[in-house]
Amino acid sequence: MADLAKIVEDLSSLTVLEAAELSKLLEEKWGVSAAAPVAVAAAGGAAGGAAAAAEEEKTEFDVILTDAGANKINVIKEVRAITGLGLKEAKDLVEGAPKAVKEAVSKAEAADLKKKLEDAGAKVDVK
């Protein structure tokens, strides 16, 4: 029991960076992911409440081009401006809709990109 108390004391004295490094080392050593038990615990609880909480906490969004609309040239120009892609790559993305224009962006940036693309004539989803 004294050994466990010593381990608790040692862990309590770790800095945040040291704790993160310890977590990574344990994940590698044991072949597990620290995120998995949290997700399972959330799913095991009140399923409806957990889903609503996950929806509220979402911080990264994907901007999906669902349809280029009638004004495809303006949409291609806007996609090029947003992504920095070349003309051919932007054209392929627009013609291959539905496709992700940008992934893992903030809510504000996703709303801004959606407005720009819709102003150019595209139909856009934010997920």
From Swiss-Prot:
Give one GO biological process term.
Answer: translation
Keywords from the UniProt entry: Ribonucleoprotein, Ribosomal protein
Any Pfam family hit: Ribosomal_L12_N
Would the keyword Ribosomal protein turn up in this protein's UniProt record?
yes
Q: Which domain of life is it from?
A: Bacteria
Q: Which GO terms describe its molecular function?
A: mRNA binding; structural constituent of ribosome
Q: Which GO terms describe its cellular component?
A: cytosolic large ribosomal subunit
Q: Which PANTHER family match?
A: 39S RIBOSOMAL PROTEIN L12 (PTHR45987), LARGE RIBOSOMAL SUBUNIT PROTEIN BL12M (PTHR45987:SF4)
> Whom does it interact with, and what assembly results?
Homodimer. Part of the ribosomal stalk of the 50S ribosomal subunit. Forms a multimeric L10(L12)X complex, where L10 forms an elongated spine to which 2 to 4 L12 dimers bind in a sequential fashion. Binds GTP-bound translation factors.
Family, according to the entry, reads as follows: Belongs to the bacterial ribosomal protein bL12 family.
The record's function comment reads: Forms part of the ribosomal stalk which helps the ribosome interact with GTP-bound translation factors. Is thus essential for accurate translation.
Q: Which NCBIfam families match?
A: L12
Name of this chain's protein: Large ribosomal subunit protein bL12
User: Which species?
Assistant: Sinorhizobium fredii (strain NBRC 101917 / NGR234)
